[in-house]
Regions:
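Soluble sensory domains of the PAS superfamily and closely related sensory modules
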Residues: 256-260
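Well-structured core secondary-structure elements of compact alpha/beta domains
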Residues: 63-87, 150-167, 175-216, 229-250, ...
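Short, low-structural-confidence N-terminal segments
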Residues: 1-89, 140, 319-320, 326-485
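Solvent-exposed, amphipathic alpha-helical "stalk/arm" or coiled-coil-like segments used as scaffolds
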Residues: 12-27, 81-118, 123, 131-171, ...
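Secretory-pathway/luminal and periplasmic proteins that interact with or process carbohydrate-rich
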Residues: 125-133, 221, 230-237, 249-251
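Short acidic-hydrophobic surface loop/beta-edge motif
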Residues: 46-51, 264-270
Length: 485
């Protein structure tokens, strides 16, 4: 696509992602120009959002949603209908950010020279095999070259605005060192039986006793295997491997990085429970390895800070702006992200009034009900969703889990088995369902395990066939009279 070619000649802007993901520049430019040519009142009536009175059209929004979904699929993501709501929300947010940035660039009267536009246009033309093909694409998009130049001018204005922000960012040597350093902690975790002060104190005392044993010379790995409740690390003697800053919860990270190699920590409390930590090793920012990695790490840190600065800048612009989103489902999704579940439920209900046959909208409402601990209301919505989209295994899985949450075990198992049946070739789905049924001690787990075995058998057959085909091809390519290495 043309826009993908253009991206190679422009700076990446992570905050403005909507159009970048695969949409044609000609299409996007044409949409923007056609939007301007239509009356503002007409466009506002057909818009997904208004940004300081400036409309974002439904057509542009829908094209960007489609482009973003295609991009995720190209990146190997497993896109299912339940994920589309989040893509729609992110697309609207990106288009709003884009509009805010363009409005700010115009407000600042950022100048763009004819030479700069010429350079950008030349880069586009050079990406086509011939001038004729460029003109055909231009005409097919309903654009004139003058209109395209106007669109490119706006793009350059936004790039210059973001360049000003980028140039304000500095990375210190201390930041580079901290980002490079890693520690290798081992830990023993004890989880309180419940949230009562007595249970927490009992868990703390247990960890304190273990810490005292360790200081007296007890083997850390042996105690971790015997007492740690972190199933992911206990069999490794509590060893978490090398981890950098930002990878661990705050309290654990601060304690681990404060230790010397071989030192045992005091009791550390986190949301997971109580820990005692031993530092096994430390990777310092020194030597040839650090020097080789330093420049790339500095560039990565700068990009992170730039993106954070852009996000903060856009948030400030939005605080000073009037933004109206005109889709109840997208509003509800945003409220869910903010943790305002009660308000989200009302907007999901309003959305359903206009789209009562949307199974996935019902699933979103059900998820909100579950957040409110309204399990029966969630089940009612999911039962309707399954009736509307019976072939979707994810909906059956959600319904099964809701039944289990309501202690309706037989109904839950029945729905889980339907989910398994409708996704017979989905290895991850089968593993998830098998794990649930095994934990419940249900004999139906064997049905799912048979499906897992069949998936593995088919995979091994395909792998064997591929290896044989590659072997035959290698033999055919070996010159006669020579010996393959």
């Amino acid at each position: 696509m043309l826009f993908q070619k253009l991206r190679k000649n422009t700076r990446g802007i992570l905050i403005v992602i909507a159009i970048a993901f695969g949409a044609s520049l000609f299409y996007t430019g044409a949409m923007a120009i056609m939007d301007r040519q239509r009356g503002k009142q007409e466009l506002a009536a057909n818009s997904i959002a208004l940004v300081n009175g400036e409309p974002i059209s439904w057509a542009a929004y829908q094209e960007n949603v489609y482009a973003n979904l295609r991009y995720q699929e190209m990146m190997g993501a497993r896109v299912n209908p339940l994920m589309v709501e989040a893509v729609k929300y992110n697309t609207v947010e990106s288009l709003i950010s884009q509009s805010l940035l363009l409005q700010e660039a115009k407000k600042q009267k950022i100048k763009v020279s004819r030479k700069e536009i010429d350079a950008k246009l030349s880069a586009i033309k050079e990406s086509f095999p011939s001038a004729k093909e460029f003109q055909e694409q231009l005409r097919g998009s309903g654009l004139t070259e003058a209109q395209l130049r106007g669109y490119l001018k706006e793009q350059i204005q936004v790039e210059k605005l973001l360049d000003d922000l980028r140039n304000e960012v500095r990375i210190t040597e201390e930041e580079i060192v901290k980002a490079y350093e890693e520690v290798r902690p081992a830990h023993i975790l004890v989880i309180p039986e419940d949230d009562t002060p007595e249970a927490k104190e009992q868990a703390r005392q247990k960890v304190q006793e273990l810490a005292e044993q360790l200081r007296q010379g007890a083997d850390f790995a042996e105690l971790a295997r015997a007492y740690s409740e972190d199933v992911g690390s206990k069999e490794e003697g509590g060893d978490l491997g090398f981890v950098g800053r930002g990878r661990l919860v705050k309290e654990f990270e601060e304690a681990a990085f404060a230790l010397e190699v071989g030192e045992i920590s005091d009791v550390v409390e986190t949301d997971y429970g109580f820990h005692v930590i031993k530092l096994l090793d430390r990777k310092l920012a020194e030597g040839d390895e650090f020097l080789e990695a330093r420049d790339a790490l500095a560039a990565e840190l700068k990009e992170q800070k730039v993106n954070n600065k852009i996000a903060e800048f856009v948030a400030e612009l939005r605080d000073d702006s009037q933004v109206v989103i005109r889709d109840e489902q997208i509003i509800a999704h945003g409220l869910m992200r903010e943790g305002n579940v009660d308000a989200a439920v009302e907007h999901y209900k309003a959305a359903l009034e206009g789209r009562p046959d949307d199974a996935y909208l019902r699933a979103s409402l059900a998820q909100a009900y579950l957040e409110q601990d309204k399990t029966q209301e969630a089940i009612q919505e999911l039962e309707q969703a399954v009736a509307q989209a019976d072939s979707d295994s994810q909906l059956h899985l959600m319904l099964g889990l809701a039944y289990l949450q309501a202690d309706e075990e037989d109904k839950g198992v029945e729905s889980l088995l339907r989910a398994s049946e409708k996704s017979a070739s989905d290895f991850l789905m089968q593993i998830q369902i098998s794990s649930i049924l095994q934990r419940m001690g249900r004999e139906e787990a064997s049905v799912v395990e048979d499906r897992i075995a069949e998936i593995q058998r088919l995979y091994e057959e395909q792998l064997k066939a591929l290896q044989e085909a590659e072997g035959n091809q290698a033999e055919e390519e070996t010159p006669e009279g020579s010996t393959a290495p």
